Amino acid sequence: MSTAYYLSKLSERRRSVAVMVGDVGVGGDHPIVVQSMTNTDTADIDATVMQVSALWRAGSQLVRITVDRDEAAAAVPKIRERLERLGIFVPLVGDFHYIGHKLLVQHPACAQALAKYRINPGNVGFGAKKDLQFSQIIEIACQYNKPIRIGVNWGSLDEALLTQLMDENAQQEKPLSMAEVMREAVIQSALHSAFAAEKMGLGRDKIILSAKVSDVQDLIAVYTLLAKRSDHALHVGLTEAGMGTKGVVASSAALGILLQQGIGDTIRISLTPEPGGDRTREVKVCQELLQVMGFRQFVPVVAACPGCGRTTSTVFQTLAQKIEANLCKNMPIWREKYPGIERLKVAVMGCIVNGPGESKHADIGISLPGTGELPAAPVFIEGKKVKVLRGHHIAEEFEEILSDYIRTRFGQHEQKRA
């Protein structure tokens, strides 16, 4: 499990029923969980193990994998075994569509190896087969004591339910808009499926709900209503958010509003990666969103000014980038070696206007000289000026001071253990 420092005020969170997914708690009093999904062919064991490992190292606490055919289902226990040999015990979530009931029955080792099953009510079965095939998955979840996520997506919404609601709406004196009917269909699909699963014997502490759409305002509306009508743990995410900056902005806008309202027990930011791009980016964006909102703390904060006409030198920018990269690189080791280091705040400022003040507010900071200022850089530690650096090696000297500060402040348990 992640050892990230948890800042969320639980009294402000929507109260939900806690669900254990492997050893990761979702909902209840547990911190908001970051999760991701592979885009490998699950039958390709080497590629899937490699990507799950990368996502886990980036900080994904749950990793979902596609289970779409026999070869993929047969690979799941082997993937689980390979990961554990590497010391990686991240819970794996099976993503099932259309034939999940068959795959789980025919591959019991897969059913056992997975920590959770994702079911899409829109394609678990059609017509008379829908209830039967849904019940088969629930029976297996009960048999192996596994939680499920009932994951509704408006791109694969239950057409029969949508048609029924549209027909009923057309008979109303003041009919709702098409968007409102669509939202209600998404919500009802999730709630009806959860109720059916509970009637079949699956506990409320085994059910997570999601109701994903691709429009920001629709997503906010859907989850706001769903949160009022259910106390199930909620998985929140904007589906098909898109590529690059657009995807990051859209997801952050939607999730930021919901999280601020206390809605969301686990999140995924679904980014379309560039060809050959880094799949772990979506994990980092999730972490950054939770961190800037003050819900969780994953890595030290490096505050740096944006630059202006007073900072024609790029020294402060280069130093800030270097320090941030070094902190991120060392965090996997430092989390264990220096408990609490994720709460560290470092300021690297570029001129006298805000530099000294911002540096004083940080745990440790430096105010580099701006254009026309004296070539001196005061260093502040815990609000007090401790040194003034001069010359051509200011950056290197500050890095040494920072390293000493980290060892002194956070390395106390190392000294005790020695």
Swiss-Prot record:
[4Fe-4S] cluster binds at C305, C308, C351, E358. It catalyses: (2E)-4-hydroxy-3-methylbut-2-enyl diphosphate + oxidized [flavodoxin] + H2O + 2 H(+) = 2-C-methyl-D-erythritol 2,4-cyclic diphosphate + reduced [flavodoxin]. One of its GO terms (molecular function) is 4-hydroxy-3-methylbut-2-en-1-yl diphosphate synthase activity (ferredoxin). Pathway: Isoprenoid biosynthesis; isopentenyl diphosphate biosynthesis via DXP pathway; isopentenyl diphosphate from 1-deoxy-D-xylulose 5-phosphate: step 5/6. The keyword Oxidoreductase applies. InterPro entries: Dihydropteroate_synth-like_sf, IspG_bac, IspG_bac-typ, NO2/SO3_Rdtase_4Fe4S_sf. Its cofactor is [4Fe-4S] cluster. The keyword Methyltransferase does not apply. Keywords: 4Fe-4S, Iron, Iron-sulfur, Isoprene biosynthesis, Metal-binding, Oxidoreductase. One of its GO terms (biological process) is isopentenyl diphosphate biosynthetic process, methylerythritol 4-phosphate pathway. Its EC number is 1.17.7.3. It comes from the Bacteria. Binds 1 [4Fe-4S] cluster. Belongs to the IspG family. Converts 2C-methyl-D-erythritol 2,4-cyclodiphosphate (ME-2,4cPP) into 1-hydroxy-2-methyl-2-(E)-butenyl 4-diphosphate. This is 4-hydroxy-3-methylbut-2-en-1-yl diphosphate synthase (flavodoxin). It comes from Bartonella bacilliformis (strain ATCC 35685 / KC583 / Herrer 020/F12,63).
